[in-house]
Amino acid sequence: MSSNLKKEETMDLDQQEFNGNAISPVLPDGLKNYLIDIDGTITDDVPNEESWRMETCLPYLGSVDTINDWYSEGHIITFFTSRTENHRKVTEEWLQNHGYFYHNLLMNKPRGGNYHWIDNHIVRATRYEGKWTKMTKKKLNIEVFE
């Protein structure tokens, strides 16, 4: 992977404490950790069983510019995909060839959708529905613990 496409430096995050014990650091206000799917989100939905298509599919219109803008603004960009480790090389080359800037690539996301993420940090979900445009804020009902 080309060094200009992956930030190697570590972020200076404030170490937080809880009851005298160190806990995971938190991003500064205004910065986000973007976890972005690949297949069906920034390019065609290519299943692992048809991996020969991974090299030739094209990015969705606006995805490169939007993601690279977030990267330039200082946000953390992580691609999180159901592609297996066997597909890492072709995936990294595809991202590089199409000019995506990112920090991390996580493979082996569980397949099948219907994701339910439980975390002690704020989690926001945005469902991609066919168009890369500016984000807007809307209030919706969500499922929470009582």
Model segments located where?
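HAD-like aspartate-dependent phosphatase fold
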Residues: 2-146
